[in-house]
Amino acid sequence: MTVDAVLIYAQRGHGRRSGVYSDYTFALWSEGDSAQTRELVPFAKAYSGLSDAEMREVDSIIRKTTVDTFGPVRSVTPTQVFELAFEGIALSKRHRSGVAVRFPRMLRWRRDKPVAEADTLASLRAFFLPR
């Protein structure tokens, strides 16, 4: 199971990654009718899947595109898309997105894909959740 999601938040990792922004929060588009009415909604955090070189490159982008900080978390301009894989999905009243994913991880950095073409929460629910 995979989706193309947008990087919206980052925080420093732990251990050998403590100096690098390597813990990421990803979002999918809401169900708005147009580009003006939809928004990015956080739905998953992922920490693994990138090479050390890719992580350093993403770290540099995060430092250049930070728009706000809250505690250890940096909010970044949504410019990067990643393909995320996960083992399962369930409905969740706890999460703003309405879904919880199991074992999310980054498969690849979608440098070829614009943010506007990232997946939507509606497509995630329709494809992966039973009716």
Annotate each predicted stretch with a short phrase:
Residues 1-131:
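Classical nucleotidyltransferase
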